[in-house]
Swiss-Prot record:
Keyword flag Coiled coil: yes
Expression (tissue specificity): Expressed in placenta.
Protein name, per record: Coiled-coil domain-containing protein R3HCC1L
Parts forming coiled coils: 751-783
InterPro entries for the chain: Nucleotide-bd_a/b_plait_sf, R3HC1/R3HCL
Annotated source species: Homo sapiens (Human)
Residue span of region EJC-binding motif: 7-27
Source organism superkingdom: Eukaryota
Length: 792
């Protein structure tokens, strides 16, 4: 009976197995959620709260379960029990959903922590002695995860680092040795992409480290390596940046400067578009650097060349005529005075001695007069001394004295040049001297065999710093020289004015003073020539430069002549159009008026002589028509029978209606029509007599026009016969589709099939067209009246 009663007793309905959690596994679920929270690197407060709520709900369910059993014993409360069970099942479902969401959140947190910690492990430098013994979480999910504490250089403190792809082999080897009692298998498909992501992260970390190294290298682009050899070899230099400029300097340990022979060496820079060129054009050797610093100049002597050129060019930096010797350039740079001296020497023909003397004076000298420059040409006896040149053939002397003081930045430059065949010489000036010194202090032409010299001295503020400077150039006549040779050289110099002017202008094209200097040199050369011709004995020219303080007029004839010629040149330059002409354009200079009259008279006399007529005729052609008093005759069309009709005649027979319409195309909009009379006559019908009168005023090359009162009889008869067809032409109104449809419907009496919406759209378009037309008319009126259109 007891068994039957147990069978008949209503049992409590068990919850669904999918939502049921056995007692043995209830604690495991709680432990699992706790472990998953610990495995997450950065704990989340929201996840903790959800887990607490889930655990509390589970406890409440377990507490309510015995009460539900007690209630189920009573059969009268069956419905109530069903409701209770439904509520409990819904609670269990909610709890399981919360647990699943907690698992997903914890898994996401673990994957994020894995990615962060793997990146930190790759960027940092972990200790090599750390060996992992925990199973890999990619394949297995243990309940208790052992986290390793690894100290890195980049991270301060201890961090929990989960294993990544780098320890895959070690972990797989150690997994089978552990028991599988408390291990649950996870979904492999869910974790395999994580492993791939770890591999990608590893690659990205390596690339980032490589780029960091490159960035560190690029932060110092100016670091480059160069090799200086004791043999002064030029070594190519590699740069790590494209924008750097290679600067090479040659140093020696022995203090001896031995430049290599002339040539151009190219240093190739990788990555840069252009090469860097170092040019060395030195063909001599200097024994010691200390000697260079202490010496005041260099003397270069060249001999044994092969051929003599016919003419000698300007003294400048250029190659020789026979291309046997390269140009020479010497540059000195001193740090104390920050001065630079340049010496340019042109190689001359054989048996030519070139003296290039360059003195350097700095602020240490109080009196510049202590350094004097003298160049004396004595008899050709072979004797030589300091600052003197004695040769027995045409020679060139080029002396340049540059003075750049630290107090006064201006410079005092001299240039003495002597060349065969009356070679014009340049006037040397320094780069700091920007003023136009057009007044030469001295200009001398020296008697010698094919020798001419010019000596110029800049004035102005330079004299203040060089007040005590006095230089003289005494030159004695050679006893056994040829006088005719000198005359030839003087004549060639006088005739070669173009060469002299070109050489003077070539120094500085921007200043007009150089041109005047060339003229002054030419005039002084003429004066020296006359003096030389008058005196046949031994002549000595002395050019002296007085001090600024001395007021005595101890100057020679040559400076006076140059001053007078200089003033004449200034007056010639100062003549301008304003001084010669007034505001009305009349000439104020009577001399120019006389020249103009003579210039006009001479061509007339010449023409009269050629034609044989001594009388000058007046050939003025009178105009045939008076263009100033031209008036359009007023045409009266009131007497005409048809004032709006005109006759068109005298046009080619090949003309058609289109051709006549093209002639009167401007009247077609207002209304114009053509009625033919014969092949050369037609009637033009206009919209009004005013338009017809306007058309009569036009001129056309192919057609002629006249009113109908002056027309031929045939034209008048045609007009009377077709009087009803010659009504004034009316302008065609602007039509639209809506207007045409309305006209057709009204004429035929047919009902329109157009809907109301289409009719409203057409009316709207018509209104927009009217508004647009009104605005255009208003804008046209505003333009004519000159009103502002911004308000429109």
């Amino acid at each position: 009976m007891q068994q039957e009663s147990e069978r008949c007793r209503v049992r409590a309905r068990r919850p669904d197995m999918a939502l049921y959690v056995p007692k043995a596994r209830r604690g495991a679920v709680l432990l699992k959620t706790g472990d998953e929270e610990e495995s997450c690197g950065s704990p989340n407060s929201v996840v903790k709260e959800k887990q607490k709520e889930s655990s509390l709900s589970q406890k409440e369910v377990f507490k309510d379960k015995p009460e539900a059993r007690r209630l189920n014993i009573n059969p009268d409360r069956k419905e109530h029990n069903c409701r209770e069970e439904k509520k409990s099942s819904t609670k269990l479902r909610m709890d399981t959903c919360l647990q699943k969401t907690n698992r997903v959140c914890s898994k996401r947190g673990t994957t994020e922590s894995k990615e962060v910690l793997s990146q930190g492990q790759q960027q940092g430098a972990p200790n090599a002695g750390v060996i992992t013994n925990a199973p890999l979480q990619r394949h297995f999910k243990p309940k208790k995860v052992e986290c390793l504490e690894v100290e890195t250089t980049d991270v301060t403190g201890h961090e929990r680092i989960l294993l990544s792809q780098a320890c895959l082999e070690i972990s797989e080897a150690q997994v089978p040795s552990k028991p599988f009692q408390n291990v649950e298998f996870c979904d492999f498909s869910r974790h395999e992409p994580d492993g791939e992501a770890f591999e990608d992260k590893d690659l990205e970390g390596r690339i980032e480290t490589d780029t960091k190294v490159l960035e560190i290298l690029y932060e110092f682009p100016r670091v480059f390596s160069s090799v200086m050899k004791p043999e002064n070899m030029i070594v190519p230099i590699k740069l790590s940046s494209d924008s750097e400029i290679v600067q090479q300097s040659m140093q020696t340990s022995d203090g001896i400067l031995n430049p290599s022979s002339g040539g151009i060496t190219t240093t190739s820079v990788p990555g840069s578009p252009d090469g860097v060129f170092d040019q060395t054009c030195v063909d001599f050797e200097v024994e010691s650097v200390g000697g260079i610093a202490n010496s005041t100049g260099f003397i270069l002597d060249q001999k044994d060349t092969d051929s003599i050129p016919a003419t000698m060019g300007h003294i400048s930096l250029s190659e020789s005529t026979n291309d046997t010797v390269s140009p020479v350039m010497i540059r000195e740079c001193e740090k104390n005075d920050s001065t630079a001296d340049e010496l340019h020497v042109k190689h001359e023909p054989p048996d030519t001695a070139v003296l290039a003397h360059e003195t350097h004076r700095d602020s240490g000298f109080k009196n510049v007069g202590d350094i004097t420059n003298k160049a004396c040409m004595m008899d050709t006896t072979g004797m030589s001394c300091s600052d003197h040149v004695t040769v027995d053939s045409p020679y060139v002397v080029a002396v340049r004295i540059a003075d750049e003081t630290s107090i006064n930045t201006r410079s005092f430059s001299k240039f003495v040049g002597m060349s065969a065949d009356a070679t014009p010489l340049h006037v040397a000036r320094s780069g700091n001297d920007t003023e136009d010194f057009s007044n030469p202090s001295a200009c001398s032409d020296i008697y010698g065999e094919s020798i001419s010299s010019h000596f110029t001295e800049s004035t102005g503020k330079l004299i203040e710093s060089l007040s005590d400077c006095a230089s003289s150039l005494p030159i004695k006549k050679i006893a056994g020289s040829n006088y005719n040779t000198f005359l030839d050289s003087e004549l060639s110099m006088l005739n070669g004015t173009k060469v002299l002017s070109d050489s003077a202008v070539g120094i500085d094209l921007g200043s007009t003073g150089d041109t005047t200097e060339a003229l002054h040199e030419l005039r002084t050369a003429e004066e020296f020539k006359t003096e030389e011709q008058d005196d046949s004995g031994s002549i000595e020219f002395g050019v002296s430069f007085p001090d600024r303080e001395s007021s005595s007029m101890e100057t020679s004839i040559e400076p006076k002549a140059t001053e007078t010629s200089h003033t004449e040149g200034i007056t010639a330059i100062e003549e301008s159009w304003e001084s010669m002409f007034n505001d009305d354009g009349d000439c104020l200079d009577p001399r120019l008026l006389q020249e103009g009259i003579l210039m006009h008279i001479k061509p007339e006399n010449h023409c009269s002589k050629l034609s044989g007529n001594t009388k000058s005729r007046e050939s003025i052609q009178e105009p045939r028509s008076d263009y100033y008093n031209h008036e359009v005759p007023d045409i009266d069309l009131s007497d005409c029978e048809f004032p709006h009709v005109i006759e068109i005649y005298d046009f080619p027979q090949e003309f058609h209606t289109e051709d006549l319409l093209r002639v009167f195309c401007s009247y077609q909009k207002k209304g114009f029509d053509i009625k033919w009379v014969d092949d050369t006559h037609a009637l033009g019908v206009f919209s009004s007599p005013i338009t017809a009168r306007d058309a009569l005023g036009i001129k056309h090359t192919m057609v002629k026009i006249r009113p109908l009162s002056q027309a031929t009889r045939a034209a008048k008869a045609k007009a009377r016969a077709y009087a009803e067809f010659l009504q004034p032409a009316k302008e065609r109104p602007e039509t639209s589709a809506a207007l045409a449809r309305r006209l057709v419907i009204s004429a035929l009496g047919v009902r329109s099939k157009q809907s109301k919406t289409e009719r409203e759209a057409e009316l709207k378009k018509l209104q927009e067209a009217r508004e647009r037309k009104r605005l255009e008319a208003k804008q046209r009126e505003d333009i004519w009246e000159g009103r502002d259109q911004s308000t429109v």
